[in-house]
Every structure is written in C-alpha cells, then in structure tokens.
Amino acid sequence: MGVGGSRLDNVSAGGLACPILPDGRLKERAMNIRSQWMTRHPDGAVFADIKIPSYDKVLAAVDRAHRAVPHFRIVGWDFCIDEHGDPVFIEYNGAPAMNQVSCGPLFGDLTEPVLNTIFLNEAEFTN
C-alpha cells in the first residue's frame, strides 16, 4: 500500500506490504523495504482494524483474470477498489517478489508439490 499520498504501492517504492486474511481483513503488522514491522500505517490507520471492501469481488476478478493468462502458473495480481466498491485491475506480475518476507511461506504444506510443478524437471531434458 502507498504511503504519504503516493499512488505507488510497491515496497521498493516506499510502500508497505501487509498480509491479507482469507476474509479480507489485514493482519496486524505490515513491513517496509527495510523489513521493519509496524502495526499502524504512517497516516495513522491501524492495520488490524482494516477490512478490504468488496474483497469477494476482488477474489472473483483475480480468478477470472488468472484463467485468461494460462501461460503463467504464479502471478502477483494488483487490484484497487474504486469509489463504488468495484475492483479495478492495475497490473499483473509474472515474477512476484517479497510475498514470503511479509506473509510467510506462500504455499505452506503444498510448497514441494508446487515447486515440482513450477520448475522444469531437469531429468526430462538430459535423457
């Protein structure tokens, strides 16, 4: 999320990364580019008190969008919510970064099967 009125939300551009719970609420802490954790946005909002409006619509939009780009298995989707509560697509990232730093292991117990699916099996190409 952006800081100081910035429309840029990238951590590398001075923004913050805050994990999102399955129901659309933010977790209690966000981090900046220096991996410093905070419980409040510099503008004063308490992260744990924030729920993303229309989060169910965002998830549905991500699902539709992801089906439209079948050549990517992992995509970082950037959406915002407009003044009417509708999701607005910003961009997709074919090589998302920083998620595990702020959110923890991305796939949990599914990490090994996901990695086996994502990375080429070298043996297939050496025989």
Question: For the regions a protein language model found, what residue spans apply to each?
Answer:
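ATP-dependent carboxylate/phosphate-activation module, predominantly the ATP-grasp catalytic core
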Residues: 1-60
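C-terminal active-site "lid" helix and adjoining low-complexity regulatory extension at the edge
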Residues: 39-60, 67-72, 81-127
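Hydrophobic residue at the +6 position relative to the catalytic HRD Asp in the kinase catalytic loop
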Residues: 77-79
